[in-house]
Design a protein with these regions (language model features):
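Active-site rim elements
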Residues: 113-115, 143
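Active-site nucleophilic cysteine motif
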Residues: 78-85, 115-130
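Hydrophobic/aromatic-rich core segments of domains that either
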Residues: 121-191
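Acidic low-complexity segments
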Residues: 2-109, 113
Length: 191
């Protein structure tokens, strides 16, 4: 068994070097590091934590479990389950700016009950529903860049065989729905 302190030390020492490596290479390097510690599920790029709760924000509460079950009743195909989660969010939610997440409790439950949130809140709800349904999902964060705007943005990627990792941007899906652009809303699922 590896010493966790050694692992933390190595990651701290590697971080500056990894920052200079392309995003793809950095992802591969981290997968190899994590995989070397036995955290891999057997599918390349998927780890146990891609299916687990991660308190305080990714929690399978009774409400989330019931919502996931209701939305996927009679469905066995993981892609269709993910599609139903996306449709629920994009067809029902409204975009609202949120305070800092550390001030919020139970973000996915609150979003599902109040029908509003921002990009990160929608991402957390989609991610939590996917994981609750046994679909590996990972948080993604970066910048949204437009000709006259640059800002932080969050989305999710989820894994379904045989397609591999696919992206979902529920926030842009919500905006597309509100604008009446169904083709664009569909685009933000799986692309």
């Amino acid at each position: 068994n590896a010493d966790p302190g050694f692992f933390d030390y190595i990651l701290c020492k590697l971080a500056p070097s990894l920052a200079r490596i392309s995003t793809k290479m950095k992802g591969r390097a981290m997968c190899e590091v994590y995989g070397a510690f036995g955290w891999a599920t057997g599918i390349p790029g998927i780890y146990d934590f891609d299916l687990e709760e991660q308190a305080p924000h990714i929690v399978f509460t009774p409400y989330i479990k019931a919502l996931a079950a209701e939305l996927t009743e009679g469905v066995t195909d993981p892609m269709e389950k993910a599609r139903r989660f996306y449709d629920f969010i994009t067809k029902n939610m409204s975009y609202t700016f949120m305070p800092s997440y550390f001030l919020l409790e139970n973000i996915p439950d609150t979003c599902a009950c109040n029908y509003n949130g921002d990009c990160g809140v929608f991402a957390l709800l989609f991610l939590t529903l996917c994981r609750c349904a046994g679909i590996p999902a990972q948080w993604q964060s970066g910048l949204a860049v437009e000709p006259d705007f640059i800002g932080c943005h969050d989305w999710v990627r989820f894994y379904v065989e045989p397609y591999g990792w696919m992206f979902v941007d529920a926030s842009y899906g919500v905006s597309s729905m509100r604008a009446g652009n169904e083709e664009r809303r569909q685009f933000y699922f799986g692309n």
